[in-house]
Amino acid sequence: ALENDGIKFDYFTKTDCLSPDTLQHYDAVMLYANHGRITPEQFEALNSFVQSGHGFLPIHCASACFGHEPRFVSLVGGRFKSHKTGVFKPVILTPNHPIFEGVKEYETWDETYVHSDINANNRAAHWPRPS
């Protein structure tokens, strides 16, 4: 369905895709996984990819990945600590940010993630939830 909008993607299940040879073919990496380990070479490839201006979108449980690699925690902006579930209303702290254009207030049910090691820098759209 997304291909009709010009969005194409490949799906990988192993971290060996995190190499310069593979990443050079992509504009962005979306990480929706719960991998335990990343090699130093794989992290360097991902970090270089991001630092050179490519996109990185760690979603859902991605902040639980690679717990042994503190530089990954810095790149993501925090580390998964725990979660519960519940109904909540997201609060947009920066409603004038372009990513929120057209987003209306809503209520949803989901896992309510709690993070540690929060990187407060460059969090233009960060929504801190009351504990």
What do these predicted regions represent?
Residues 59-131:
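An acidic, glycine-rich "communication" segment
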Residues 1-26:
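Aromatic-Pro/Gly-enriched surface loop or interdomain linker
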Residues 1-8, 32, 49-52, 75:
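Structured segments of extracytoplasmic/periplasmic soluble domains
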Residues 15-18, 43-44, 111-113:
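A generic local structural motif
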Residues 9-11, 56, 124-126:
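Conserved beta-strand scaffold positions in the cores of enzyme catalytic domains, especially
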